[in-house]
Regions:
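Phosphate/NTP-binding elements of NTP-utilizing enzymes
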Residues: 1-424
């Protein structure tokens, strides 16, 4: 439970993911102790600032012939941009604004537990992967912000790491791709112009960050970074073609229509075929809620979870799934320590009960690693449904349940999975 509810401090970097080091710069962010990504230490100028101990001392030593106020402002901006470039969690909170699901104004993007897990996969592949490309197949069942995290991360790559790095956003309907792009547009326009440019690079103070193509309404340009963002729909496959894409986000793939002219696989291929995944910072996320087992998305998910005799994954994609018990809002705290003890005793006593699902609740604890507070919530939530299957459909505990209850089958899905593995 502690891990599930753990929070990080995005401004100071305390408890934030990734390898970090402690430092203090007296006149930067109010002189607070900071935990910064170790990758920042590769910058000689940054190391010199740390050695001086403050922005003012650095300016006096290395920029004495310049107006000191302007020099300090330039160094401050340098530090902010460098921090944003190497610390996605800081950038997301400081500059990305997302819709407040409770209503009201947009809020800073503070990643939740599930989003942190996905971002760790992104960062692991970017920093330590063999090719430094980012390739994920994302199975989602509950709304935990996977698409939001994906889009902000794609924007971050275009913003700080790559110019002329074009992206393709494909949905099963034009509205789904447009919705994703609207969030992208909001993000781009909220960021100050100077942050788009390297320190010292000249630029015009123009509030326009995005421009729509004069020939195609589904294409927009991120002007300061010379990046193209194209949206497309599986119902209009030609809109998915992009000859120079380096990144793609394919959303709700399992619901792509299957026609005589265009299969879902052809639509996906049209979107990703231009992307050379051997180049660092290329990015593909194939994401969907499940829609049974008879579709290309399910087949690719199975391949991503399968390995050859040498232990190599059969797919280029790394699978990512979030069960309900890894989403922090699905817990029910106990009123007292005694109530918790009584619940544990009840759980153990009924661990072999099939009729009232005690064996399943015990499986969540012993095999799946769900928290007691999570199982407490699950048991209580089950009372809304006439049977356990209804609950498992809404809140799957693993990918097997996710695909089972999104389609129809007359066979035990776990037995089917065992048979599939035996056939490899």
């Amino acid at each position: 439970l502690t891990s599930l509810l753990a929070t990080y401090r995005p401004i100071t970097g305390e408890n934030a993911p990734g390898l970090r080091f402690e430092c203090v710069i007296e006149d930067f962010l109010k002189g607070k102790k900071l935990w910064l990504p170790v990758e920042m230490l590769k910058e000689k100028k940054f190391c010199a600032i740390i050695k001086c101990g403050s922005i003012s001392a650095f300016c006096e030593k290395y920029m004495a012939d310049l107006d000191q106020e302007k020099a300090r402002d330039a160094v401050f901006r340098y530090l902010i941009r460098l921090r944003c470039k190497h610390d996605f969690y800081f950038f997301a909170y400081a500059y990305a604004r997302i819709k407040n699901k409770d209503g009201g104004d947009d809020i800073p993007f503070l990643l939740n537990h599930a989003q942190i897990g996905l971002t760790k996969d992104f960062e692991r592949q970017r920093l330590h992967g063999e090719l430094h490309s980012i390739l994920i197949i994302l199975l989602k069942c509950r709304q935990w912000g996977g698409s939001t995290d994906t889009e902000v991360y794609m924007f971050w790559i275009q913003m700080f790491w790559k110019t002329n790095w074009n992206s393709n956003i494909i949905g099963h309907q034009s509205s789904s791709a447009t919705q994703v792009f609207d969030m992208y547009e909001k993000l781009a326009n909220a960021i100050p112009t100077w942050l788009y440019y390297e320190i010292g690079e000249t630029f015009k103070e123009d509030s326009r960050k995005l421009r729509t193509s004069s020939t195609q309404n589904n294409i927009k340009y991120l002007i300061p970074r010379s990046c193209k963002i194209q949206t497309g729909s599986a119902r209009n496959p030609e809109s998915c073609r992009s000859a120079d894409a380096a990144m793609a986000h394919i959303t709700e793939e399992a619901f792509f229509p299957n026609t005589t002219e265009w299969t879902p696989q052809k639509v996906v291929n049209a979107a990703i075929s231009p992307i050379n995944v051997t180049r660092p910072y290329t990015f593909i996320v194939r994401e969907s809620t499940p829609n049974g087992r008879e579709n290309e998305f399910h087949d690719e998910w199975v391949r991503a979870n399968s390995f050859d005799k040498d232990g190599n994954r059969l797919s280029i994609y790394t699978p990512y799934f979030v069960p309900w018990f890894d989403i922090e809002k699905y817990i029910l705290p106990f009123k007292s320590e005694q109530e918790k003890i009584d619940f544990v005793l009840w759980l153990y006593k009924n661990r072999e009960d099939e009729q009232y699902h005690g064996s399943y609740f015990w499986w969540l604890w012993e095999i799946k690693g769900a928290t007691l507070e999570g199982i407490h919530w699950y048991v209580n939530e089950c009372k809304k449904y006439s049977d356990l299957d209804g609950m498992r459909q809404e809140y799957p505990s693993d990918d097997v349940e996710a695909f089972l209850f999104s389609g129809t089958t007359v066979f035990d899905p776990y037995k089917l999975k065992e048979m599939e593995e035996d056939c490899k």
